[in-house]
Amino acid sequence: MLAKRIVPCLDVKEGKVVKGVQFRNHEIVGDIVPLAQRYAEEGADELVFYDITASAHDRVIDKSWVSRVAERIDIPFCVAGGIRTIEQAREKLAFGADKISVNSPALTDPSLIARLQDEFGRQCIVIGIDSYYDASSDSYMVKQFTGDESATKDTQWFTQNWVEEVQKQGCGEIVLNVMNQDGVRQGYDIKQLSMIRSICDVPLIASGGAGTMEHFEEVFSLANVDAALAASVFHKGIIDIQALKRYLKDKNIAVRI
């Protein structure tokens, strides 16, 4: 059985790590490299960095901090933010990132996924999906440019349809960001994640809602995701990564200790 992964998420804005609630009201948490080092030392399996305003502001991730992170940590990390071309992706990988993630640019041009996969291989192409539950229509919809609330917009995609499309285009992994749950620490959206799991043939990472160790156990046991991403519980010291892994191991969930 493949080990389940614990993945701290670092949202980056103007060179600092920030965290919001439901993608709004972001506050500064700390500096990029020290936080990355801390999580690597604490036993994280992987890190994800999102430059949250890059796509909305029509720019790309600052490569300088990508290279600094690569010099200081020895676990895989993924970067996202404004990557629209093969050349931009190549640069980030050359500076030390193990994977690149694409979200809003893929919604604008879905064929970008196929071009990236052809160039670099599916194993390092991650698609981030910002999914919002619309109670009025009882449906999950994909939103775009969510890093800047003034730029956020609806798309025509139902989440499940977009999950199917990005797999057809050749993505290697999907991060499902459940916007309604983000930062509120009330648990992952097991219903939505289970639905997506049933149509997702690539590794699926749950994002949004972690508040307790039990929430991690639930998302692995009930939704059968491959990895669980979280931010505020790690940034605020609510959950220690090694303690979390010991807890999960005691619950018979395969993790790397």
UniProtKB/Swiss-Prot annotation:
<dbReference type="GO" id="GO:0000105">
    <property type="term" value="P:L-histidine biosynthetic process"/>
</dbReference>
<dbReference type="InterPro" id="IPR006062">
    <property type="entry name" value="His_biosynth"/>
</dbReference>
<keyword id="KW-0028">Amino-acid biosynthesis</keyword>
<dbReference type="GO" id="GO:0000107">
    <property type="term" value="F:imidazoleglycerol-phosphate synthase activity"/>
</dbReference>
<feature type="active site">
    <location>
        <position position="11"/>
    </location>
</feature>
<dbReference type="InterPro" id="IPR011060">
    <property type="entry name" value="RibuloseP-bd_barrel"/>
</dbReference>
<keyword id="KW-0963">Cytoplasm</keyword>
<dbReference type="GO" id="GO:0005737">
    <property type="term" value="C:cytoplasm"/>
</dbReference>
<protein>
    <recommendedName>
        <fullName>Imidazole glycerol phosphate synthase subunit HisF</fullName>
        <ecNumber>4.3.2.10</ecNumber>
    </recommendedName>
</protein>
<dbReference type="InterPro" id="IPR013785">
    <property type="entry name" value="Aldolase_TIM"/>
</dbReference>
<dbReference type="InterPro" id="IPR004651">
    <property type="entry name" value="HisF"/>
</dbReference>
<keyword id="KW-0368">Histidine biosynthesis</keyword>
<comment type="pathway">
    <text>Amino-acid biosynthesis; L-histidine biosynthesis; L-histidine from 5-phospho-alpha-D-ribose 1-diphosphate: step 5/9.</text>
</comment>
<dbReference type="InterPro" id="IPR050064">
    <property type="entry name" value="IGPS_HisA/HisF"/>
</dbReference>
<comment type="function">
    <text>IGPS catalyzes the conversion of PRFAR and glutamine to IGP, AICAR and glutamate. The HisF subunit catalyzes the cyclization activity that produces IGP and AICAR from PRFAR using the ammonia provided by the HisH subunit.</text>
</comment>
<keyword id="KW-0456">Lyase</keyword>
<feature type="active site">
    <location>
        <position position="130"/>
    </location>
</feature>
<comment type="similarity">
    <text>Belongs to the HisA/HisF family.</text>
</comment>
<comment type="subunit">
    <text>Heterodimer of HisH and HisF.</text>
</comment>
<dbReference type="Pfam" id="PF00977">
    <property type="entry name" value="His_biosynth"/>
</dbReference>
<dbReference type="GO" id="GO:0016829">
    <property type="term" value="F:lyase activity"/>
</dbReference>
